[in-house]
């Protein structure tokens, strides 16, 4: 079968479904490809959706931004990109095996399951983590937007990579850790 990529169109859509209660914003990517086999042509369109979780941080944007690198360090995730202008810290390609931040990886991503349990706990998983602090309409409060996505490979057998979707657990943990870090810093600053 001959594979011809005629068009690779990416369509990014941010749906307006993020709420003040921390609902997800959906980012969609659509890719169109054509496969040719003999005299037959197959047009395939695939769509991938990624949730962007938004959660409230009980501090102004500057305080939250200053505390965010400490959260990455505590999780043992090396920041790949730090953009002070847009308040984004990310690492879009880091490898994790079995656990992340002392917790089973399956708490944060779902890569399917095997006969011995959640596949994420048995695979080499490459994760993408993008976190942004944004201002909120409320005084003294900011918002944390985070997105987790990944791919896993079972190194014990020859296998294709599988998509590992976020469970929302890592996004929630990062928000809790950030609020805790800010609270700790505030208590230290008060005599």
Residues covered by each model-derived region:
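Bacterial N-terminal signal peptides that target proteins for export
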Residues: 1-7
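C-terminal motif of bacterial Sec signal peptides marking the signal peptidase cleavage site
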Residues: 14-16
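Ser/Thr-rich, low-complexity intrinsically disordered terminal regions
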Residues: 18-191
């Amino acid at each position: 079968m001959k594979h011809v990529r005629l068009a690779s169109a990416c369509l990014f859509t941010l749906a307006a479904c993020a709420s003040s209660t921390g609902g997800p914003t959906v980012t969609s990517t659509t890719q169109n490809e054509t496969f040719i086999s003999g005299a037959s042509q197959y047009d395939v369109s695939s769509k991938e959706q990624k949730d962007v979780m938004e959660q409230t941080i009980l501090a102004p944007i500057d305080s939250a931004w200053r505390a965010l690198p400490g959260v990455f360090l505590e999780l043992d995730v090396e920041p790949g990109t730090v953009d002070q202008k847009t308040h984004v810290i990310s690492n879009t390609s880091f490898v994790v095996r079995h656990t992340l931040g002392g917790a089973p990886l399956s708490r944060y991503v779902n890569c399917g399951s095997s006969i011995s349990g959640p596949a994420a706990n048995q695979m080499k998983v490459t994760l993408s983590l993008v976190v942004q602090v944004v201002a909120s309409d409320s005084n003294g409060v900011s918002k944390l937007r985070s997105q987790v996505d990944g791919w896993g490979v079972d190194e014990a057998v020859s296998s294709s990579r599988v998509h590992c979707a976020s469970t929302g657990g890592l996004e929630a943990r990062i928000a809790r850790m950030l609020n805790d870090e800010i609270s700790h810093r505030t208590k230290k600053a008060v005599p």
